[in-house]
Amino acid sequence: MKKLQIIFLNYSIKLKLSMNSVIKTTILGCGSSGGVPRIDGDWGVCDPNNVKNIRSRCSILVEKITNDKKTVVLIDTSPDMRQQLWKAGVTNIDAVLYTHDHADQSGGIDDLRVFALRKRERVNVYLDKDTASRLIPRFNYCFKSGEKHGYPSILSENIIDPYKELIISGPGGEISFIPFLQHHGSIFSLGFKYNNIAYSSDVVDFPNKSLNYISNLDYWIVDALRVTPHPTHAHLDKTLQWIKDFNCKNALLTNMHIDLDYEQLCNELPNNIKPSYDGFSFSIDI
């Protein structure tokens, strides 16, 4: 009997170990709306010899990996999405989440077509009502089949509400996201919290209701556009104060303009704060 109990105990331990999952976050792009360098070759103060200063437009990939199976979630479809996903080796997307509809977050949307063709089904896109009201008319052909363009739609829209849990399912298991509102000039953008990590790419301030979602984080990927203040984005000093005030353990700066050099930031920032760079990733066990 004892031998049988030991066998079952060992089996249970092995089963638990085999079901361990990780959440992997990849910074696909961390540049401002014009990227670094700008299209005219302007690097600003960024050293062109440092590859970590080459910044495509903002986007991240969130993956839950369980026993070599993945649930893959893309946040925003930047104009650089094709190259970003190719470099990251992405062959499947289970869902796309949108922070807002600005061109640097949505310009690559048409390249989602390949994932719809591979799966022979529409890709699920999640966005709030305000973003949908602007994004869907602009890219109507992606969401609605029609005689005018002659192509089937490739995307299915799903309207989400701020502060309500969103669960994305896929081969690697479920990922829980909480969208929260952020002030972004004259509009709201969405931040997303998952597994005590938050993504805040385009933000100048937060409504009071959102503060709980950015407090005591393990990781915060957060907007730090430039050195001087800006009407729609947080500048460096403001972001650093947020990180301190909200007791964030680790922070990664994103949406960085040409006046923020990677090496200079590394030398000046506290140890728990780093500038992002395209392709950087980190994982946590869950």
Predicted regions and their residues:
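Active-site-proximal loop/helix segments of hydrolase catalytic cores
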Residues: 184-190, 194-223
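Binuclear metal-ion centers of metallo-dependent hydrolases, dominated by the metallo-beta-lactamase
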Residues: 163, 207-286
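Binuclear metal-dependent hydrolase catalytic cores
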Residues: 4, 15-200, 266-286
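Short hydrophobic targeting helices and cationic amphipathic motifs
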Residues: 9-11
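Catalytic metal-binding/acid-base residues of hydrolase active sites
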Residues: 80, 102, 204, 225, ...
